[in-house]
Amino acid sequence: MSKTVLSKIGALLLPLIFSVFCAFPSFAQTENTVTIQAKDIALEKVMQQIEKQTRCVFLNKDVDVKENVSVNISGKTLSETLNILFKGKDIDWKIDSGHIIISKKVAQSKATEGKATTSQISGVVIDEEGVPVIGVGVLIQGTTIGTGTDLDGNFSFVLPEGMENSSLEFSCLGYTTQVLKIGNRRVFNVTMTSDAILMEGTVVTALGIKRSEKALSYNVQQVNADEVTMNKDANFINSLNGKVAGLNINASSSGVGGASKVVMRGMKSISQSSNALYVIDGVPMYTTARDGGTQFASQGSTDPIADINPEDIESISVLTGAAAAALYGSDAANGAIVVTTKKGKEGKLSATASASVEFMTPFVLPRFQNRYGTGDLNSSIGSDVRSWGNLMNDANNPKYSPAKDYFQTGVTHNESVSVSMGNEKNQSYLSGSSIDSYGIVPNNRYNRYNFTFRNTTSFLKDKMHLDFSASFISQKDKNMTNQGTYNNPLVGAYIFPRSNDWEAVRMYERYDVVRRLSTQYWPIGDAGMTMQNPYWINYRNLRENRKDRFMLNAQMSYDILDWLNISGRVKMDQSTTKYTEKFYASTFTQLTESSQNGLYGISQMTDRQIYADFLVNINKRFGQDWNLQVNLGTSISDMFYDALKNRGPIADGQMSAERAGIANVFNVQNLSNSTKTTRLQDGWREQTQSIFGSAELGFKGAYYLTLTARNDWPSQLAGPHSNRKSFFYPSIGGSVVLSQIIPNMPKALEYFWNT
């Protein structure tokens, strides 16, 4: 990447980074000193101020924190602050691993000391794996008398007289509440069991809506970020191979960073695409497939989703089937892959860095015979490229093998660094990564550089939330391998006659004294399939692609009530691509539009997507049994594409009244004026306006009914002769969780009806 581009990126990001750092308080100061001036306020409020300034958390073991206190503390350490705050009060405190544990002082006289063993309730609480559980509430049932477990799961408190016939209640979020009779028992060692219902996870579904996993009437499979980054691929989609049931990923032959085809549960159409829709943080990423060209001008290509940095991914949800992605309309008829990216986290500044090196060699190759030499004993036609001639012996057998003689060891360097920082109001995330790859065929390169900044903040008493992110991707690839026979070096590497000398064709060009330039050396000809010297294709049929991509995303939400909120988001995704072709003189003329002087092509393309939506979200319980989740919204998607293309043969004087151009000089002024030269400005714009809604009704956490509907008004149907102006996409689904109805239900049979 050039210094100019880097300087522009620095000029863009430095003010943002500086403003974010200025927004944060100094962590070092808040850890060492505390300053509080308060008069006649609740002790609980003072404790909250201490938590904010020290990043410690209070654990309260039966202390009344509602009483009012007055304090005037300035620049004191945490220990000094606690001594001042609790001076003269019946409160003990201690600091342990970032926790401040407070409890009542227990004063026992000698007269009652002997009875303490009979009135002291104590014990330890662990989970099913034997790990101490912190924060378990231990209360005498029906009262507020009790305490909570400390960092080691221990608890103790004084049992008041006359309550021996009561019961102890052990409760903690995510665990099943336990009730045990006290009686004569004074020591309780309790094992908490996970509550399968409370521990139910949520998944990210269409439009970024989070829903309970058990309530879904369709299949959603989640993939954690670790599974994507464990074995990194330049296109992270390839890392999903084998991790999602029913997902078939076909990586292209273009090499590192090449496009991949993702098909869920089989092909859906012969003539139309069966590829899944990609969704990044709730916003669809529409793939504007680049024209692959004609049979003589084909080009390997990458994919917009391949530009995403795997290290920026938090999680991936795979929505299989039309019902799962109905809220996206026809674009997600083949399913959707929903990607959630990372954001800053509250706490101290943290930085992570990673580096990896990957080596690549061909895994599966055709089996080649090495017994018969060049020629064909049954036919003299085309025998120069066949390998069914006379038997070879050790003396005349060069033992040519594409694996060791043509392919090289590919190397991919992947480096990334990320920084996360923030407080309870403001969090930021920054990351940068680079991929530098050398392919397994000569002169094949792929380079990509990613820069991301994201900031989330909340204000208006935490009712309003703002999420802003910006990304810049610079990508360059060179000589991505084409599929088929034209411009594909593997054709010559595989068909090369077995007894010919491969070392001779390594020198792929020879100087022609007549033409006064270097020309291709390939003694066996094109074999009727436009076959060329593989090294000539690698070094003299150059195809280079350069892309700069900007993504800006902003989202704002406001909590009107605890069960009602509204949100809106807007995203711009713009790519500028420059693609060049340089075919040198003596390339087979079938590939250069019959020119002896070569071919040149240059295309500059810009595509831009602007997406915006607005949602009203309702999530409300009615009584103990009913739950309703409703999402209503509208969206607009605007797509723009513009291209300027010049491609044609370099003038060689074959046309009348046309002067010959200069061989191997690649510019548009040197192109022939023949009809085979293309000079084209192309472009289009389309827009889709939509309304959508979903409703999910749950009963007793066991029965769920889900309805969705979407109506699209695409611009393609806006013409006066269109018989239909819009499309309507409804869906209905339901599920029954038998484990909520039948006790001890085997896990494999929990979901009875899920359609």
Give the ranges of each region predicted by the language model.
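Small-side-chain secondary-structure face that scaffolds active or pore-lining regions
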Residues: 439-452, 471-473, 479-484, 544-549, ...
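Outer-membrane beta-barrel transmembrane domain signature of Gram-negative proteins
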Residues: 392-420, 584, 590, 594-702
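Short acidic/polar hinge/loop motifs at secondary-structure boundaries
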Residues: 155-160, 283-320
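N-terminal periplasmic "start-of-domain" segments of outer-membrane beta-barrel proteins
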Residues: 24-35, 57-70, 131, 137-154, ...
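N-terminal export/assembly leaders
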Residues: 15-112, 142-150, 156
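A surface-exposed, glycine/aromatic-enriched loop/edge motif typical of exported proteins
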Residues: 366-385, 473-524, 581, 636-662, ...
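Residues embedded in well-ordered regular secondary structure
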Residues: 213, 222, 229, 243-246, ...
